[in-house]
Amino acid sequence: MNCLVIGGTQFIGRHLVAELIQGGHTVTVLHRKPKHGFGRRVKNILADRNDPRAMKAALAGKSFEVVFDNVYDWQRGTTAAHVEGTVRAINGPLHRYIFMSSVAAYGDGLNHHEGDALAPDDAADLYVRNKATSERALFRLHQRIGLPAVTLRPPFVYGPANPLYREAYFWDRLRAGRPIIVPGDGRRLMQFVYVKDLVTAALRAMTEKAAVGHAFNIANARPVAQSEFVDALAKVCRKPVKFVRTPREYLLRAGGHPMGPRLYFGLYLDMPPITEVTAKAQRVLKFKPTDFSTGLAETYKWYLRHNHAAKQDYSFEDTLLKHAPVLPPATKV
């Protein structure tokens, strides 16, 4: 099929483009850079997806059968209006419009099914609001004009080539023999999905007729506690882990923030838990997640080959460790 990948040069998009090429599809990447690194097999469109006029001009005279809308602008936000503008700029009949949403679209809460209400239009968190309103806009277009929309709702995505300082954050510290700061008792839940599993789900959404007009939760079936997550990372790199359980309020008061620059538990990982149930994806998309330990092992292999970053600055953590009140070990999770 003739596929347009919006945001195909980073994490999820790079894996997706590679699989599309492997599958013999024609691939075009739309992004804001003049080059994409995929070679001649992949066409390039230079445009800012947050600019409806630029999108219309860039896509004029071009048609696609499938659109994978992966990109989110963390600095400016990507709104429902931006997503609608992209849909209206696409020429020709579409076979599928696959939108990368997020578990965050639910706003909060545990064990969500796809039919649960999404966050309201006035949700305080910009990312939450934009994902929820974008999904609503796409499904309105599905009802009104027959847009063959599918939305995917992953939680934390991990895997090789992750540009976010998440898995590598902990491996850097474990390999350096440093203690790991855990906010609170370490029992806050997290849910993950392997990037290659997410890409497989997107590809199946492209071909499965029953997927049209539906949202899908794409995740490992079982959430893990924060301390379990670190234990799994330590097991993969064969390093002992020393937890320092510290009140979350102290970490924030001292200047720590989940989004940085003063991180204390990786980038954007210490968030109120939102979890989801994946039975629908298993049934319709035949979704079978990779075992967490297997996915982490593959990710660690990539980390070892590519971990050539500058020496990390641990001064903020050293200050925290020096002055932080330490909580007693949590009971078995």
Which residues does each predicted region cover?
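Glycine-rich Rossmann NAD(P)(H)-binding loop
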Residues: 6-7, 159, 183-188, 216-223, ...
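Conserved SDR Rossmann-fold cofactor-binding beta-strand/turn motif
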Residues: 153-154
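Substrate-positioning beta->alpha
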Residues: 164-170, 183-206, 213-214, 294
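Conserved C-terminal active-site "lid" loop/helix of NAD(P)H-dependent oxidoreductases
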Residues: 195, 254-288, 307-308
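Mid/C-terminal beta-alpha module of Rossmann-like enzyme folds, strongest
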Residues: 204-265, 298-300, 314-333
